[in-house]
Structures are given as C-alpha cells and as structure tokens.
C-alpha cells in the first residue's frame, strides 16, 4: 500500500518522508508545488515512488486513480506564511484542499493525518485543545481553525477512518532552509553567527526583559516521531497540540546555537552573560510594527497527547539545537 505525503518537499513533509524511509517505506507519493524550485533539495536523499503537483494529485485522486491503493495521507502541504493576507488563496489552499482530502479519506477509509497550527490560539494564554481558548488573529490561523472545527463536528457524528490534526508550535530543525524569513530562529541565529560572529535578538518590551520572550520550541525530530506514533495507532483520532510542553526564552536558542557552533570551532562554551559581555549576543529595539501583534509566550499543553499514549520525552532547546547545528554544519561544512 502507498502512503501519500503532501508538502513533501517542504520542511516537515520532507522530514516525514525521511522518517518513513528509515522504516524501510519507500512506496511514497510525494505531492507538492515546486514553484519554489529550491525545495527539491529536501528530497534528494529521500526515496519516493512518484512525484505529483498538488493540483494534479487532487484531480487524479478524485477521479479514482488511486482507489484501493492508499493506506494513509500525511497532509503537510499548505501556505504557512502567516504574513500572507490573501484570504481567498489561503482558504482555497489550506481549508478547501484539506477538506477535499479528508472527505476522500473518510469515503475510502484511509488514515488522514494533517498539519493544524498553534496559530489557532491567537493571543490566548492557555494553549489547550478547547474551543474557549481559540481565537486566530490572521487568515492563516483561521484557515487551520476552520478545518479543526469541521473535524470536531465529524468526530461527533462518527468517523469511518482515523483523522488527526497536529497543532504545531515553533518547529525547528533540518530541511527548513527554503523558508527564508519564515525559517526558525535557530536557523537564522546559526547563519548570523557563522557570517558575523554574533546573533541578534529583540530587546525587552511589554514587561519582558531582553531576549526573554518565550516560545514552545519543538524539534522536527519529535514532530516526525509523533506523526509516526499516530500512523501506528489508527484507532486514535482528534486534534492534538504538538510542542515540547515547555516554554523557553529566545535567549536559550541563542545560547544553544552559539555554543554548538563554538564546539565545532574547538572553543569553550560561554554563558549567556559572557556572550552579551563579548558582544556575541546583541539586542535590537523591539519593532514598532510588532507591538500589540506579538505573542511573547507560548507553551503547548500536551496532556491530551500524553493521554493518547505518546510517552517519549521531547528534546529541550539545548539538545535539539545542538543536533540541528551538527546537521547544518554537516551540510554546509
């Protein structure tokens, strides 16, 4: 049986393809939009059986081309640029496309795992998979929220096959280089340090000290493991937060990135205070454009994920960033 991965050349999608390969699974249809041609690099070291453009795939799927051949669709393909304000494009790409795949999977009794987002919570301070805590602030978040609402209703009515949505928090790790400004802070810090010998962070604002704004940073390694756990457990459906379950300040990311780079340079680790004193960590004024629109704190409540049976420990920023820097240096030299 064949597994479909949409967004397969993207960040999380390509890591999922690699994770499936590591299990010996290569009968994979990779679906994506390679208008950004550089994304193909993410699949060069992966094994797939076929590639299709996302529009061609949906057309063939609904025409019955793959009837009886698919075991699962891992749907990671979407417009993830939170600054894209084209509502029609966002809803067509993120909501309608997801709905079409979901309906097909229910009809054909195929497992369906898809990417939701922590953007569904908006400026909330409680990050728990419950309606009262949700309030997206942009059309990207709304497109994800709306399909989550559809799934909730369909679960009440009764599903014919597994359907799982993952609310990804701040994911970082290998194969994100094509994302440009939307890539993780760890990726940008790595490049800043390698090019300039220092990294830049937002200074304090709204009661937060320099670099102390915090996020739930989750390694893509853990994201892949959780996806595969649910693939192995087709009886579990629902919407789940996928973060580390801990909030860590941007200072931690800077410190971890710099020290991982220094390790490769044969230099001793430094404390954050030493980095600041030596000018390696530099704080810039908090941008006026972000004031009032910026989340200074996120932390996934992963109790529901644990209740579903996923018991593995999540990587800390220090652990995950260290491994990520090893990978980046291995690729870039």
UniProtKB/Swiss-Prot annotation:
Alphabetical keyword list: Carbohydrate metabolism, Isomerase, NADP
Cofactor: NADP(+)
InterPro entries: Epimerase_deHydtase, Heptose_epim, NAD(P)-bd_dom_sf
GO biological process: ADP-L-glycero-beta-D-manno-heptose biosynthetic process; lipopolysaccharide core region biosynthetic process
Pathway: Nucleotide-sugar biosynthesis; ADP-L-glycero-beta-D-manno-heptose biosynthesis; ADP-L-glycero-beta-D-manno-heptose from D-glycero-beta-D-manno-heptose 7-phosphate: step 4/4; Bacterial outer membrane biogenesis; LPS core biosynthesis
Listed transmembrane segments: none
Cofactor: binding details: Binds 1 NADP(+) per subunit.
Assigned EC number: 5.1.3.20
Binding site for substrate: 170, 181, 188, 202-205, 215, 294
An example molecular function term from Gene Ontology annotations: ADP-glyceromanno-heptose 6-epimerase activity
Enzyme class: isomerase
PANTHER family assigned: ADP-L-GLYCERO-D-MANNO-HEPTOSE-6-EPIMERASE (PTHR43103:SF3), NUCLEOSIDE-DIPHOSPHATE-SUGAR EPIMERASE (PTHR43103)
Assembly mode: Homopentamer.
Record family assignment: Belongs to the NAD(P)-dependent epimerase/dehydratase family. HldD subfamily.
Domain comment, as recorded: Contains a large N-terminal NADP-binding domain, and a smaller C-terminal substrate-binding domain.
Function: Catalyzes the interconversion between ADP-D-glycero-beta-D-manno-heptose and ADP-L-glycero-beta-D-manno-heptose via an epimerization at carbon 6 of the heptose.
Name this protein carries in UniProt: ADP-L-glycero-D-manno-heptose-6-epimerase
Species per Swiss-Prot/TrEMBL record: Chromobacterium violaceum (strain ATCC 12472 / DSM 30191 / JCM 1249 / CCUG 213 / NBRC 12614 / NCIMB 9131 / NCTC 9757 / MK)
């Amino acid at each position: 049986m064949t597994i479909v991965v949409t967004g397969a050349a993207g960040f999380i999608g390509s890591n999922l393809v690699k994770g499936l390969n590591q299990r010996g699974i290569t009968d994979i249809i990779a679906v994506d939009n390679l208008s950004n041609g550089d994304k193909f690099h993410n699949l060069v070291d992966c094994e797939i059986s076929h590639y299709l453009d996302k529009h061609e795939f949906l057309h063939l799927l609904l025409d019955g081309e793959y009837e009886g051949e698919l075991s699962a669709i891992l749907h990671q393909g979407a417009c993830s640029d939170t600054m894209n304000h084209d509502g029609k494009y966002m809803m067509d790409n993120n909501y309608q496309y997801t709905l079409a795949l979901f309906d097909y999977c229910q009809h054909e009794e195929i497992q369906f795992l898809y990417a939701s987002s922590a953007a569904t919570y908006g400026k909330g301070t409680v990050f728990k998979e419950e309606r009262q805590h949700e309030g997206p602030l942009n059309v990207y978040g709304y497109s994800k929220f709306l399909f989550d609402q559809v799934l909730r209703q369909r679960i009440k009515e009764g599903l014919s096959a597994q359907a799982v949505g993952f609310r990804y928090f701040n994911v970082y790790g290998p194969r994100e280089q094509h994302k440009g400004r939307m890539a993780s802070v760890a990726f940008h810090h790595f490049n800043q340090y390698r090019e300039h010998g220092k990294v830049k962070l937002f200074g304090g604002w709204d009661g937060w000290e320099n670099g102390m704004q915090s996020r739930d940073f989750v390694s893509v390694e853990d994201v892949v493991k959780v996806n595969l756990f649910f693939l192995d457990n087709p009886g579990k459906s629902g919407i789940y937060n996928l973060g580390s379950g801990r909030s860590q300040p941007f200072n931690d990311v800077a410190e971890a990135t710099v020290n991982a780079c220094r390790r490769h340079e044969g230099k001793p680790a430094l404390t954050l205070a030493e980095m600041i004193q030596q000018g390696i960590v530099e704080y810039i004024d908090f941008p006026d454009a972000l004031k009032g629109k910026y989340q200074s704190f996120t932390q996934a409540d992963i109790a529901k994920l644990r209740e579903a049976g996923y018991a593995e420990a999540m990587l800390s920023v220090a652990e995950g960033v260290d491994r990520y820097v090893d990978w980046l240096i291995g690729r870039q030299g």
